[in-house]
Amino acid sequence: MNKRMNELVALLNRYATEYYTSDNPSVSDSEYDRLYRELVELETAYPEQVLADSPTHRVGGKVLDGFEKYSHQYPLYSLQDAFSCEELDAFDARVRKEVAHPTYICELKIDGLSISLTYEKGILVAGVTRGDGSIGENITENLKRVKDIPLTLPEELDITVRGECYMPRASFDQVNQARQENGEPEFANPRNAAAGTLRQLDTAVVAKRNLATFLYQEASPSTRDSQEKGLKYLEQLGFVVNPKRILAENIDEIWNFIQEVGQERENLPYDIDGVVIKVNDLASQEELGFTVKAPKWAVAYKFPAEEKEAQLLSVDWTVGRTGVVTPTANLTPVQLAGTTVSRATLHNVDYIAEKDIRKDDTVIVYKAGDIIPAVLRVVESKRVSEEKLDIPTNCPSCNSDLLHFEDEVALRCINPRCPAQIMEGLIHFASRDAMNITGLGPSIVEKLFAANLVKDVADIYRLQEEDFLLLEGVKEKSAAKLYQAIQASKENSAEKLLFGLGIRHVGSKVSQLLLQYFHSIENLSQADSEEVASIESLGGVIAKSLQTYFATEGSEILLRELKETGVNLDYKGQTVVADAALSGLTVVLTGKLERLKRSEAKSKLESLGAKVTGSISKKTDLVVVGADAGSKLQKAQELGIQVRDEAWLESL
């Protein structure tokens, strides 16, 4: 029976690839169904012989309890956006300062959900969402139901690949028709539908909705020397790679491709929202490196957003956690990018003056970055009033005088006891990217603050279960869950806490970078600004902001109180040791290692202070080689780069 099951699995997987990947089926649907039923019968009779790559894993029935957090071994960076040819020119100029004659590769920017797929010995072991780039959610069981994702690879590889999971337009129409017939609300757009599907706890629902993928990158150190070769390699492994791409030598060629894609966009069977431009050569990518948030070797050109006219009804002014006062326009409702929009940001007081926005104006609204509704400009031909908007002089929360500093575009409240700032700071502290306290959202924080149960973030850790029962609408079960979530957050790695403190210019990526170097918030609080500014990707502005924050008596008291309540102040990730054996060295791993997994070798190198990259360049200090090292070993020898073997690495 095992032989026949092997034959059926191989046949069905080949036919599925022909159908879903190549769009060139060699058998009829009825023949596929006949073979599939035969396999199901055999697997039912011999469950102990079911193969890992059996197509039956893709259908049917598992109801999941939830999604576990998953730490990405290789961080997923965001991309810098560009909205004009001039911004692409600026990107090209920055690249050419480091790379004399770059070749670019242009790929379609699929409007889906970023995913990371990890294979061990050629078997899919983890499918994860992007999350915040460092930690995502493990949705492996759902991604196994996406029919064009290989469950096994033709080689026994340890590899992590990245791509986009999306819902084709035809599938979107079918899903929405079914929801309409069932009296369920329709999805606004294919991206929302894909996101909602991947969040399903019932995997059978995922299997029915016909999601698809395009893979675009090997995240683990690549064995290829260019992005184009990497894409071809992914195709060889059985992944679906978007064929619509070009190599370009200059911005004119890139711009022509963007214009061509823009004209074809509506006729594609899937949604795109732009074109991604990357330096093709991987060694050049290594030379260019990264900022804290994004690679310097890539940019995402975004197509102009959809625009609609709406009438300005009124303006609300709100205070954020840093004291900035932001105006929000209340508008006549309009349909925009699949959703109803009745509020849009006006950014700041200088923006209102620059655009000369007045009462009752008709304005053009769009979604900035396809996400945030914003007012773009006034339709002056439809102006009905010359009356200017009322600009507040006092804080809408605490009534303190508002200031408008010369070097700032916004009004600002500088009262440290401003209730709105304190409450927004508490909401930020509990948010997903900060301390990630499940259930402690804005509405609960507002109730706690109004009940005078919390005045600063340390108070959160003094709360007891019974305190939550004092809040309207909170029952015993919810109170217990909130208390447990707060206790669990005490164990977070310290970069979550540092970001949660809301220090100006210190975002989540900067927080992680700082803690990798200083290992604890207490060490960081004692560091001098020169030491902070010397860290790669940081600088004087961040160093000064940290120095200002930690110099205050309030910060010292707050850290002491947090520590006393049991909150962890130490970094739990991979640290950088200043005097480690390989501190500051750029190292490339190549070839097949005999005793260590590649991930183990990478972790060891990083623990010794090395930066592990995938391509050899003039910035490479050391190459660790295994069997069949090939062209990378040859290139290292040509460049005179030091070469070591696996035994040497194990001896460190």
UniProtKB/Swiss-Prot annotation:
Cofactor section: Mg(2+); Mn(2+)
Positions annotated to bind NAD(+): D29, S30, E31, Y32, D33, S78, L79, E107, R130, E164, K278, K302
Molecular function via GO: DNA binding; DNA ligase (NAD+) activity; metal ion binding
Assigned EC number: 6.5.1.2
Keyword NAD carried by entry: yes
Pfam families referenced in this protein's UniProt entry, alphabetically: BRCT (PF00533), DNA_ligase_aden (PF01653), DNA_ligase_OB (PF03120), DNA_ligase_ZBD (PF03119), HHH_2 (PF12826), HHH_5 (PF14520)
Source domain of life: Bacteria
Gene3D superfamilies: 5' to 3' exonuclease, C-terminal subdomain, 6.20.10.30, BRCT domain, DNA ligase/mRNA capping enzyme, Helix hairpin bin, Nucleic acid-binding proteins
Gene Ontology BP annotations: DNA repair; DNA replication
UniProt keyword annotations, A-Z: DNA damage, DNA repair, DNA replication, Ligase, Magnesium, Manganese, Metal-binding, NAD, Zinc
Domain BRCT: 577-652
Catalytically driven reaction(s): NAD(+) + (deoxyribonucleotide)n-3'-hydroxyl + 5'-phospho-(deoxyribonucleotide)m = (deoxyribonucleotide)n+m + AMP + beta-nicotinamide D-nucleotide
Annotated SUPFAM superfamilies: BRCT domain (SSF52113), DNA ligase/mRNA capping enzyme, catalytic domain (SSF56091), Nucleic acid-binding proteins (SSF50249), RuvA domain 2-like (SSF47781)
Keyword Glycoprotein: no
Residues binding Zn(2+), per UniProt: C395, C398, C413, C418
Cellular component GO terms, alphabetical: cytosol
CDD domains hit by this protein: BRCT_DNA_ligase_like, LIGANc
Active site: K109 (n6-amp-lysine intermediate)
Function: DNA ligase that catalyzes the formation of phosphodiester linkages between 5'-phosphoryl and 3'-hydroxyl groups in double-stranded DNA using NAD as a coenzyme and as the energy source for the reaction. It is essential for DNA replication and repair of damaged DNA.
Record family assignment: Belongs to the NAD-dependent DNA ligase family. LigA subfamily.
HAMAP family, per database record: DNA_ligase_A (MF_01588)
The protein's name: DNA ligase
Organism, scientific name: Streptococcus pneumoniae serotype 4 (strain ATCC BAA-334 / TIGR4)
Gene designation per UniProt: ligA
